[in-house]
Amino acid sequence: MLNIEINSKEYNIPNKWEEMTVDYYCGLLEIIKKYQITEEEEHSDNDLTKYRIMQENKMYKELLIYMTGISSDKVVHIPMNDVSELIKCVDEIIEEYKPKGMDYFEFEGDIYYFPMDFLRTGTFGDYIESQQLELNTQYLKNGRFDILPEQMAILCKQVDEEVDLDNIDEKAKKFRGLTMDIVWEFSFFLNKRTLASINVIKTFSEMAEQKVSQ
């Protein structure tokens, strides 16, 4: 945690992946995306120097408000050394995550496993999981981290836990409290399993076609 004192009040700001929840990170991403230069603006003939500076200043102001909870009228009075620390914190957050090869995680006293074995059994439940893997990969490509808690609630299970799509909301809500190191590990796991999931979908599709043709 980054510990800073502003106007005699101490603030603890998450600056490591294992310290921030999915919800917190999604909030940061939304602000950062809001002030990105669009492709159309990038390729325009206009000089964007001044505009870039204005957008960056607005972005950092909104990020400071989000990270500290300080009102917009008070944020302008934050000492520059504290602002520099917060900006450094943001820069660290958007650096690339280095995976450790995790295939399970502990959360609120329970152990959940990534879907490692679905290729071995070949059940319809495994087919559902393979579809979720493919769907998750598309979400990640589009930066939709906000969707991942629900998808992880479906795919990441305790030993002998069954997939129950009708009662997944409570688990998904709980998983919004997962920290980003776990979510990143899951995303890297997905990238490795995408090809396998496509093969499973293809296999089940071929089986269905054979059934129809018989």
What are the residue ranges of the model-derived segments?
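Charged interaction scaffolds used for protein-protein
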Residues: 1-214
